[in-house]
Regions:
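Short amphipathic alpha-helix segments
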Residues: 14-26, 107-120
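Conserved small/polar residues in nucleotide/adenosyl-binding loops
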Residues: 152-159
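Short glycine-/aliphatic-rich beta-strand segments at the starts of folded cytosolic domains
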Residues: 2-10, 92-102
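Short, low-order "capping/linker" segments at domain edges
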Residues: 81-96
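Helix N-cap motif at beta-to-alpha junctions
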Residues: 47-53, 141-147
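The feature marks the first
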Residues: 2-40, 44-47, 51
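A short linear hydrophobic-aromatic micro-motif
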Residues: 29-34, 70, 122-127
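A common structural junction motif
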Residues: 27-28, 61-68, 119-120, 155
Length: 162
């Protein structure tokens, strides 16, 4: 598992392809995902050592700042992030269900990581801006008391209040 992941979300497809190329050349990172999302945005998800991921994201964010919607770097992503992104998560049972919807992909992944780290919940799915006019959503499950706790932490997190 990578020690860090980072994302750049671009407003245009052409910028996304150029940014992905710059990111791969700037540092020793693995491109996990580089694809078009709705409505014509482009998302690049990279993994690697923290310093490499940060350098890679910074290069794209700096060079294409007028076309970058959002970015993030997570130094120690929760292990449940990837199964939720790739649709392979299999929670043992579903008790209470939590759903969070965002307008950008980066904020959703940061929110999912925070939710998984601050409450005893299982991420079910992270739907990343496909088929929803650019919106993203996540579903998670946990006890009737744990799911609201995760959302309390999300509401308090400064970068997620938009």
């Amino acid at each position: 598992m990578a020690r860090a992941i980072g994302m750049v979300e671009c407003t245009t497809v052409s910028t996304g392809f150029k940014a992905a190329d710059e990111m791969a050349k700037a540092a020793d990172v693995e491109i996990l995902q580089a694809e078009v999302t709705c409505p014509g945005k482009f998302v690049i998800l990279v993994a690697g050592e923290l310093s490499a991921v940060r350098a890679s994201v910074d290069v794209a964010a700096g060079k294409y700042s007028d076309k970058v919607m959002d970015t993030f770097v997570l130094g120690n992503p929760h292990e449940s992030i990837f199964p939720a992104i790739y649709g392979t998560a299999q929670p043992e049972k579903i008790e209470a269900l939590g759903i969070l919807e965002t307008y950008d992909v980066a904020a959703l992944i940061v929110a999912a990581d925070l939710a998984a780290k601050t409450a005893i919940v299982d991420l079910i799915e992270l739907r990343l801006a496909k088929g929803m006019c650019g919106k993203s959503y996540m579903t998670l499950t946990g006890s009737v008391s744990a799911v609201p706790v995760s959302y309390t932490h999300l509401r308090a997190h400064e970068t997620l209040r938009h």
